[in-house]
Curated annotation (Swiss-Prot):
UniProt-listed Gene3D superfamilies: Bira Bifunctional Protein, Domain 2, Nucleic acid-binding proteins
Catalysed reaction, written as an equation: tRNA(Lys) + L-lysine + ATP = L-lysyl-tRNA(Lys) + AMP + diphosphate
Source organism, top-level taxon: Bacteria
Subunit structure: Homodimer.
One Gene Ontology biological process: lysyl-tRNA aminoacylation
Cofactor remark from the record: Binds 3 Mg(2+) ions per subunit.
Binding sites annotated in the UniProt record for Mg(2+) 1: 413, 420
Keywords: Aminoacyl-tRNA synthetase, ATP-binding, Cytoplasm, Ligase, Magnesium, Metal-binding, Nucleotide-binding, Protein biosynthesis
UniProt-listed CDD domains: LysRS_core (cd00775), LysRS_N (cd04322)
PROSITE patterns reported in the protein's UniProt record: AA_TRNA_LIGASE_II (PS50862)
Name this protein carries in UniProt: Lysine--tRNA ligase
Family indicated by similarity: Belongs to the class-II aminoacyl-tRNA synthetase family.
Enzyme Commission number, as recorded: 6.1.1.6
Length: 502
């Protein structure tokens, strides 16, 4: 018999015993009571009483009602020490036969298993080792767990099981719970920041007839009642800018985007984005906003501007570097023989890209080639927080052209740790220019570029009514959460990441 078969046999045997215990509970009446009311959380009790002198605490006779999942138990004859875990942390229980009604210790507490959820009433005291503990006077089994905790709670180490059965991961791993608490604080902090700046939170369509706002491959579905194909949105941008046209001059949205593309440590097909738009601002203002926001999040969440990620360390208290795409490519491509002239001539750029092993697509113009060269030689060098400016207009179909050099745009991308975290720009509000760029995207799609944008004629009509000078930005919430939680994979910060079916 294999080791796996032995484990499955043991599991089946343990589950059978637990089901028999549940059957006995059902025979007594309500096996899943719902009348217990907790009045204290474990961590709150530790915060308030850990420093209290044991004798003084005993004299106070503080009564509490706590509840949680049984994580450990140590039986010592007529008494048992039990550790329960609630949403805030863990606390120890002292359950003694003599402190309970007759028969309860043997007939009730004696049948409890690891993983069961219990409600406890008792008084606080300190053990000889000075551990805050609840001396139990009343007990109630609230939920009988039919399956044991993973590996008797020695830890859940199988990464795939952690992702597929996140509930087990959260029960077993304090670090995972911390990660998702940090993620929640990131979202709450962003919302608080923008509301304090006078922005209005809005919601725009998830199902769109024309997917727009980014260059990506969309998910396609069909609306039966309307008999029309629809797309899960790849970005909310075009709808948010319609709202600015309508007079909502500061708007933001925290919501999901969907892109039918690859899965990696940095990519999940379903992900969360912040996207915001500010009228009468330009991309310089948004870079300032972003620095301020990330600095505030670091202080509020970590208590410091120093953010550690793996072996890297970032100081969000310092000004972020700002460099153009062309300058970064020349700076970090010098050891590969790249010079300025290679980035401003189509034939030289194409030859340079091919020399670097880049497969140049037929639909690419100079801007796309230069961007590919940048990604090959420079992107991974942008370790410290860096705003990359001056992206080619060809790859920025919604961004405003730079006044001094119309071949590039007033756009920035934020890189931290060699990864893109955010993307923003002064918005293109010239309806005729936008129409021409949409036509160029259509031509690229017809030439085989699956990620080229669809043309949204209604958006052009909206621009024809007049969009004030506006700047907008998108920030990846998942990647920000990875950063603040020091999580190596995007799957570590998404509660239920996309997984291949078994």
């Amino acid at each position: 018999m294999s080791e796996q078969e032995v484990k499955e046999l043991d599991l089946n045997g343990e589950m059978l015993v637990r089901r028999e215990k549940l059957a006995a509970l059902r025979a007594k009446g309500n096996a899943f009571p719902n009348k217990f009311r907790r009045d204290a959380l474990a961590q709150d009790l530790h915060n308030q009483y850990d420093a209290e002198d044991g004798e003084i605490l005993k004299e106070k006779g503080i009564e509490v009602q706590v509840a949680g999942r049984i994580m450990t138990r140590r039986a010592m004859g007529k008494a048992t020490f039990i550790t329960i875990q609630d949403m805030s942390g863990k606390i120890q229980l002292y359950v003694a036969r003599d402190n309970l009604p007759e028969g309860v210790y043997k007939d009730d507490v004696g049948t409890w298993d690891l993983g069961d959820i219990v409600g406890i009433k008792g008084t606080l005291f300190k053990t000889k080792t000075d551990e805050l503990t609840v001396k139990t006077t009343e007990v109630q089994l609230l939920t009988k767990a039919l399956r044991p905790l993973p590996d008797k709670f020695h830890g859940l180490t199988d990464q795939e099981v952690r992702y597929r059965q996140r509930y087990l991961d959260l029960i077993s791993n304090e670090e995972s719970r911390r990660t998702f608490i940090i993620r929640s604080k990131v979202v709450a902090g962003i919302r608080e920041y923008f509301i304090s700046k006078g922005f209005m939170e809005v919601e725009t369509p998830m199902l769109q007839v024309i997917p727009g706002g980014a260059s990506a491959r969309p998910f396609v579905t069909h609306h039966n009642a309307l008999d029309v194909d629809m797309y899960l949105r790849i970005a909310p941008e075009l709808y948010l800018k319609r709202l600015v046209v309508g007079g909502f001059e500061r708007v933001f949205e925290l919501n999901r985007n969907f892109r039918n593309e690859g899965v990696s440590v940095r990519h999940n097909p379903e992900f969360t984005m912040l996207e915001y738009y500010q009228a009468y601002a330009d991309y310089h203002d948004l870079m300032d906003n972003t620095e301020e926001l990330l600095r505030k999040l670091a202080i509020d969440i970590l208590g410091t501007t120093i953010v550690k990620y793996g072996d890297l360390e970032f100081d969000f208290g310092k000004p972020f570097e700002r460099i153009t795409l062309h300058d970064a490519t020349i700076k970090y491509g010098a050891d590969k023989g790249i010079v300025k002239e290679d980035l401003y001539d189509f034939d030289r750029a194409k030859a340079t890209a091919e020399r670097l092993g880049i497969e140049v697509q037929k639909s690419w113009g100079l801007g796309s080639i230069v961007n590919a060269i940048f990604e090959e030689v420079a992107e991974h060098h942008l370790i410290q927080p860096t705003f990359l400016n001056g992206s080619p207009a060809e790859i920025s179909p919604l961004a405003r052209r730079n006044d001094e050099n119309p071949e590039v745009t007033d756009r920035f991308e934020l890189f931290i740790g060699g990864r893109e975290i955010g993307n923003g720009f002064s918005e293109l509000n010239d309806a005729e220019d936008q129409n021409e760029r949409f036509d160029a995207q259509v031509a690229a799609k017809e030439a085989g570029d699956d990620e080229a944008m669809f043309k949204d004629e209604d958006f052009v009509v909206a621009l024809e009514h007049g969009l004030p000078p506006t700047a907008g930005e998108g920030l990846g919430i998942d990647r920000l959460a990875m950063l603040y939680a020091n999580a190596p994979s995007i799957r570590d910060v998404i509660l239920f990441p996309a997984m291949r079916q078994k």
